[in-house]
Amino acid sequence: MRILSSLAFVIAVFISCVAPARAADAAHDADVAAIRQVVQQFQAAIIAHDGKTLGSLFLQDHDSWLAVDDTATWNEIKAKFPTARKVRRSTWQKFVEFVQTSPQPIEERFYDVRIDTNGAVGSVYFNFDFLSGGKINNRGAESWQMVYTEDGWKISSMLFSIGS
């Protein structure tokens, strides 16, 4: 009888430890899925030249957008334009305008997408290539910082490299 009560105690302790972990895993998985949906909406909006949808994915009252040349690209630019800057600021609004007005088909393809989140903030990191008129005109790495707002997950900042 003592063995059975000890076994019951061990099982009860195990279940009490596993249940909260599974609930936390489920919440984390739901956040990752929601962020992945933002990634997919971003890609679809570019292809569709849909500036309204694309703009809705960003935190509206905040803007941090940086482009950084990779070494080879930087060396080429510096040779032609000695006063050029390696790191350049822009805005998500300018990107939305570009997407809406591009006369050619455009697409950004993502590879090796990695998402991390604690449910309040998140990050997305991936390799990409950007196509214009069916031809690659940029490739590199990109990262997004994301925040969970009253309206769901939003991109709060973006950093990407420019390469060939």
Regions found by a protein language model. Name each.
Residues 7-17:
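Bacterial N-terminal signal peptides
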Residues 43-44, 56-76:
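Short, solvent-exposed secondary-structure junction/capping segments
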Residues 58-59, 69-70, 126-130, 159-160:
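A mature extracytoplasmic/lumenal domain signature
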Residues 123-125, 137-164:
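Short beta-strand edge/turn micro-motifs at domain boundaries
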Residues 78-136:
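Surface-exposed, charged secondary-structure patches
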Residues 19-60:
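Short, low-complexity N-terminal intrinsically disordered segments enriched in polar/charged residues
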Residues 1-6:
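Positively charged n-region of N-terminal signal peptides that target proteins for export
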